[in-house]
Amino acid sequence: MKMGGSKRRVSSKGLGAVLKEQRAKLYIIRRCVVMLLCWHD
């Protein structure tokens, strides 16, 4: 079973994708919060 090797490959590539997704989500959430704050004012 070569699960260890494939897992390493997936994790190294997957980590980058996950980080990018989290960054995008954080950015969108921040924009939404800023918009809400601006609308309140």
From Swiss-Prot:
Transmembrane segments: 10-29
Membrane topology of this protein: Single-pass membrane protein
Keywords, in A-Z order: Cell membrane, Developmental protein, Membrane, Transmembrane, Transmembrane helix
Disulfide bridge partners, by residue number: none
Localization in the cell: Cell membrane
Gene Ontology CC terms: plasma membrane
Annotated tissue distribution: Mostly expressed in leaves and, to a lower extent, in roots, flowers and stems.
Record Pfam families: DVL (PF08137)
GO biological process entries: negative regulation of cell population proliferation; shoot system development
Ranges where the record places region Required for DVL/RTFL small polypeptide activity: 10-41
Signal peptide region: none
Main subcellular location of this protein, as a coarse class: membrane
Superkingdom as given in the UniProt entry: Eukaryota
Role summary: Small polypeptide acting as a regulatory molecule which coordinates cellular responses required for differentiation, growth and development, including leaves shape, pedicule elongation, inflorescence organization and fruit maturation, probably by restricting polar cell proliferation in lateral organs and coordinating socket cell recruitment and differentiation at trichome sites.
Entry's family note: Belongs to the DVL/RTFL small polypeptides family.
Protein's name according to its UniProt entry: Small polypeptide DEVIL 4
Species in which this protein is naturally found: Arabidopsis thaliana (Mouse-ear cress)
